Amino acid sequence: MSKTTNKGGQSIGDALKSWFTIAVIILSFLIALLVYLKIMGNPINFEGGADLIKNKVPSDKWHPLPGNYLAMVYKGGLIVPLLMTVLLVLFTFSIERGITIARASGKGKLNVFVKNLQNYLANDKIEDAIAACDKQKGSLANVMKAGLLRYRTLQKDATLSKDQKILALQKEFEEATALELPMLSRNLVILSTIASISVLIGLLGTVLGMIRAFGALAQAGAPDALALATGISEALINTAFGITGSLLGIVMYNFYSTQIDSFTYKIDEAGFSLVQSFAAQEK
C-alpha cells in the first residue's frame, strides 16, 4: 500500500510520529468541537432561544435565525467539527512552515548574501566569506560555512590531488545540504494530505445530508419540508467546508514548495560558485 509523501521524502506516517503534530491535531479537534457545540450550537442563534432548552426541543428541530451563519453552519451536522479541525491544522502548520522557512533564510536577503559570497570567493577572501555566513545565519549560511571551512582545510592539505580535493569539497556540500533540507520540508506532507482529504470529508458530509433529504422525501404523505431543507443545507455546508479546506491546502502546499525549490536552487548556486572558485585557484 502506497504512502503519501512530500518532495522531501517524508511520509504522513513519519509526520504523525511527531508529538507536536499529534498535539496539534488533538487540540484542534477539541477547539473545533467546543466552538461547534458551545458557540455555533448556542440556542440564542436559533428561533426560540433559551426556550428550546427549557422545552427540551431536539437540536435537529431547531431553526436558525434569519441571517445567522453560525446556526447555519451548526446545522451542517457532526462532520462540521472534523472539517473545522482540518482547517485549524492547516492554519497551524502553514504558520509553522512560514516561521521555519523565514528562520532558514537568515537575517538578510538571500540574493545579496549569495552575490557577496561570490565576490569574496572571486577575491579569495575566505575569512570574510565565513564571517558573512556567521552574520547571515540560516540554512544557506550553515551549508556555505561548512563548505568554506572545508575549503580552507583543503587549501592547506598537500596530501590530496586537485581532483580529490574537489570531490571532498563537493561531498561536504552534499552532506551539509542533506542535513538542512529535511528541516525545510518537514510537515509539508501534512499540507498535501489536507489538500487531499478535506474535500473527501466534505463529500462524506454531503452524502449524509442528501441521505437525510431523501429520507424526508420518502415519507408517506406530504414530505417533511423542514427535514428536507435541513438535509440539503447540511449537504451544501459540508461541501463548502470541504472545498475550502482542499483549496487552501493546495495553495499553501504549492506556495511553500516553491519557496523550498527556490531555496534549494540558491544553495546549489552558491555551492557551485565555491567549487568553481576552488578549482580555478587550486594548482
What are the residue ranges of the model-derived segments?
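Residue-level signature of catalytic and energy-coupling elements of molecular machines
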Residues: 77, 91, 129, 144, ...
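Predominantly long cytosolic amphipathic alpha-helical stalk/bundle segments
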Residues: 5-10, 65, 93-95, 99-100, ...
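Helix-termination/interfacial motifs at the ends of transmembrane alpha-helices
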Residues: 8-16, 36-56, 62-63, 72, ...
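Long, non-globular segments of proteins
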Residues: 1-2
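Hydrophobic membrane-targeting segments
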Residues: 7-110, 256
